[in-house]
Amino acid sequence: MGRNTELRILLADHDTRVRSALQTLLAQEMDRLVIRECTDIACLAAEIKTYKPELVLLDWELPGRPAAALLFAFHGLGSKPKVIVLSARPEAEKAAMAAGADVFVCKGEPPEQLLIRFRELVQGLGSNGRDSTE
């Protein structure tokens, strides 16, 4: 993938099975991942500030305040993470993208779709100066 540094990822989904599947899927794609997990918006907000992930995979229906409000808050960060929004509801795409998501993936799509979008974002991280090997 062109990155020789660790990639900090935050998985935010209330469902343990979804987080586990995402972690397994991403670990097969890259070996230098540091992944943390959140189960609600409060945890996600705290982890964004302290962990400073480069990439967030966010369940649009995550318990707590609306995910859109949190995405808008990301804009105030010095280094906004890339965000892939996941939802079981395809109709949520417009709202997620308007709130600042970089990518929207419906949970009903094949895992390959998520991997394609993941690769695109990771390559973008490497080309915008955030990769320390450049």
Place the predicted regions along the sequence by residue.
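Non-catalytic signal-transmission and effector/linker regions of two-component phosphorelay proteins
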Residues: 1-10, 16-18, 23, 110-134
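Acidic di-acidic motifs
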Residues: 13-14, 88
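Two-component/phosphorelay signaling modules centered on CheY-like receiver
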Residues: 16-36
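Acidic, metal-coordinating helix/loop segments flanking the phosphotransfer/catalytic sites
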Residues: 37-55
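Conserved phosphotransfer cores of two-component systems
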Residues: 49-51, 73-80, 99
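Conserved phosphotransfer microenvironments
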Residues: 57-74
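Alpha4 helix (beta4-alpha4-beta5 surface) of REC/receiver domains from two-component response regulators
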Residues: 69, 89-105, 109, 113
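Hydrophobic/aromatic residues positioned on beta-strands within the core alpha/beta folds
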Residues: 84-86
